[in-house]
């Protein structure tokens, strides 16, 4: 079964083809440089860029794969959560293809797809604890199958990825700033007493990162001159990412701030994920840990999750960094998994922007 996946939930336009669970090819275009001018994603600009790019990217993907529309069996698309205008572009395009070619249409939960994407590299083992850490969400799930997700913990305010971007902005680093904080964090040893492990002195499974963001802001104000005076030039950014070369004029304390912030986020995720495993019955009830989302590309977060899985004696599904950020492969793979179970949607499929509950409204077809 060959499945086309379409992702347009935020500021990446991405398409991919999965054939019987294996990735055939993928294309992706990011709008990060465009939105960096505004310090964050501008929804209207994002949807216009998706509309401008999606058709030509589809043509390019099909040409690269040597396929026609008639060679696709299933069309899957991210239906939410995300930005409404962006989602409408992807869902509208998917519906048009399905209507013209007669393929089955599968609407995919973007968050679930992040967690299932690890299955492209290694067979997933269920039941699993899902740890989703992205720019808009920090969620803990019990996952029993590709269709059955139970939310057990979530952020009450800022998501971890949002905290990374806001701290990067405080330091005058470019948007999105998580990768720069990660690289700078390797240039110093963290001070575990510098920043709190927020919202861990309780017995629940929810997160709150607003206090950590405030703690960083307070520290920076008390230690003036820690942030860059101006954003680095592109050449300096590339030197930092590729060769660990500090930008000119970087304050001496900046790597320490990044290392300590990285450690605070990673420790918080470790504490809550370990607590979730205990609540869900531990090794006797949970067989693996799945970590996903853009922040899962952070090296310290990856190390903390590796430690957790090793301590608990569980399989760890940690996708490669390319599969952590928004991509078409995760949508295609999830669509293939669901279609393999006989699940699909009608052409009345609704988009579900952030804030709306995505219903389990699949149509079951035994054939």
From Swiss-Prot:
Metal-binding as UniProt keyword: yes
Source taxon at top rank: Bacteria
GO biological process terms, semicolon-separated: tRNA threonylcarbamoyladenosine modification
Any one Pfam family match given in the protein's UniProt record, by short name: TsaD
Residues binding Fe cation, per UniProt: 110, 114, 326
The protein's required cofactors: Fe(2+)
Cofactor binding, per record: Binds 1 Fe(2+) ion per subunit.
The protein's Enzyme Commission number: 2.3.1.234
Alphabetical keyword list: Acyltransferase, Cytoplasm, Iron, Metal-binding, Transferase, tRNA processing
GO cellular component, one term: cytoplasm
Xref: SUPFAM superfamilies: Actin-like ATPase domain (SSF53067)
PANTHER family xrefs: TRNA N6-ADENOSINE THREONYLCARBAMOYLTRANSFERASE (PTHR11735), TRNA N6-ADENOSINE THREONYLCARBAMOYLTRANSFERASE, MITOCHONDRIAL (PTHR11735:SF6)
HAMAP family registered for this protein in UniProt: TsaD
Task performed by this protein: Required for the formation of a threonylcarbamoyl group on adenosine at position 37 (t(6)A37) in tRNAs that read codons beginning with adenine. Is involved in the transfer of the threonylcarbamoyl moiety of threonylcarbamoyl-AMP (TC-AMP) to the N6 group of A37, together with TsaE and TsaB. TsaD likely plays a direct catalytic role in this reaction.
Entry's family note: Belongs to the KAE1 / TsaD family.
Protein name: tRNA N6-adenosine threonylcarbamoyltransferase
Species for this entry: Oleidesulfovibrio alaskensis (strain ATCC BAA-1058 / DSM 17464 / G20)
